């Protein structure tokens, strides 16, 4: 019985881990987002499978955008209370790589991500939560001005 539970736990753990990691890859997220954009962001035009993919796309990108915005707010607070130029430069550096301004239009965020992903296919196996997307797209398009 212990052996069976052990095998089952490995089986479920491995499939869950692979699914979670796969959805975080830029190429995978692009394949989830593009049909949603092609349907002009109308869920009713999508198959059930593509509706699920669209929700994964939207929640992932909005989550990243909101995290970057929260970081921007925190960095602004620290920047105002920084007492030397070295600290201020470090905070500006952090904001230029990881932070972003508030994203007001989620559809524009998805369109921008899709365009960025199409132009940066060399990053498709990288994770969306990594530096490349945050620095090269989010922090530039939605610049966090301290």
Task: For each feature predicted by the language model, list its residue ranges.
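Classical Sec-dependent N-terminal signal peptides that target proteins to the secretory pathway
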Residues: 1-19
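Compact alpha-helical subdomains of small soluble proteins
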Residues: 21-22, 28-42, 68-146
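N-terminal, post-signal-peptide region of Sec/Tat-exported proteins
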Residues: 44-75
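Short, well-structured alpha-helical interface segments that form or flank functional binding sites
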Residues: 24, 28, 51-59, 133
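Generic hydrophobic secondary-structure signal
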Residues: 4-10, 57, 61-64, 134, ...
